[in-house]
Amino acid sequence: MTQDTSTYYVWIGGSCDYGHKERAGGAAVVIEHNGNIISRDVISDLHTTEFRMMLTLMIKVMLEIPEGSDILFLTNAAYIQNFDKTPTSKSANPDLIIQCIEEKKRHNSVGVKIVQYHKSPLLIETHDMATEAMAKTRKEYHQKNK
């Protein structure tokens, strides 16, 4: 993929462990701008999903990137393609989608591009970061609640 030097390319991935009763979810980003990695971030929580974590992190990224920017989120998670579509009564995470719609207004353009996971080393890195953060959150929870 040829990168435009003015666009912020945000690789975003998530992970969720549906097999545990406390169901931890996590999301991570690697942000590229002007051909360089400028930041990495990761979040995780209990009793959530990776999609909720990914939308939360998208909002955080849109708040942190300078107003008026061009942002392209790169992911293999088709779910987040609808981050800027008005939620319906059947939409999951309508609260976060509404926040995404609001934050998108601050920028020149914000989009999502679906990429192949196995061909995207930075996307693989985000998944690994999210999985690690999720495991840490779960471990801390169990240590506190022994």
Which residues fall in each region the model found?
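RNase H-like nuclease fold core
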Residues: 1-52, 64
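Intrinsically disordered, low-complexity segments enriched in small/polar residues
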Residues: 6-7, 115, 139
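RNase H catalytic domain
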Residues: 15-21, 59-127
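Short, low-complexity, polar/charged sequence segments that are solvent-exposed and flexible
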Residues: 28-31, 91-93, 131-135
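Short, surface-exposed, polar/charged, turn-prone segments marking secondary-structure boundaries
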Residues: 36-39, 59, 98-103, 139-144
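Short amphipathic alpha-helical face segments that pack within enzyme cores
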Residues: 52, 56-60
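Charged phosphate-binding loop/patch that engages nucleotide di/tri-phosphates or the phosphate backbone
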Residues: 124-146
